[in-house]
């Protein structure tokens, strides 16, 4: 029998900040490293025949980095800010992450105004729907206003659509018992965003399909 005192606890404060920072560093290091590699090629006198390739690498990686930073500003920024976002603006942020990816995203969110917390939930849910399609497929993100709540839905359909155990734990608000923290923190962050706003988050996973349903009070 497991001792309750030794069971993993949910992170807060510095521990939560460290996990988010680690996630962001992991996301940023690939395009940042590619930019550095391109600059090295430009400086190499023996590789001048590769200048066009180097510039292409730098440009593509810079666009990826800009897209990641813009997304992270909304996905992980302070939810207490008075700033609001339009549906089209949020769709563009998520679309910036799909370039060159295997999964497609159908953004069916109306071009209305969303609070910071609602925007955070929307973009994270859409991102996780695409992340559930490691071998490609189609993801859908939808949102609608009901009398008492904003309802956000996400669906992922593909040949290997699935949730990793770490993601399943995070999406249900459970601590990470084992596995990779980087696979857990963003799903947990979505759960935390929704529940801190007084809402609920439901997730269903079956063969070839994963669905998300969040409700946040208006």
What is the role of each PLM region?
Residues 209-217:
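Short C-terminal beta-strand
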Residues 51-104:
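Conserved DHp (HisKA) dimerization/phosphotransfer helix of two-component histidine kinases, i.e.
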Residues 148-187:
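Glycine-rich/acidic phosphate-handling loop/turn and adjacent ATP-lid/helix
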Residues 18-38, 43-45, 117-145, 186-196:
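Conserved ATP-binding N-box helix of the HATPase_c
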Residues 198-205:
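Glycine-rich ATP-binding loops of the HATPase_c
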Residues 9-19, 102-130, 134, 177-182:
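Conserved short strand/loop->alpha-helix "switch" segment adjacent to the catalytic nucleotide/phosphoryl-transfer site
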Residues 1-10:
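Cytosolic coiled-coil signaling helices that couple upstream sensory modules
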Residues 42-54:
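Conserved catalytic segment of histidine kinase HATPase_c domains, centered on the N-box/ATP-lid region
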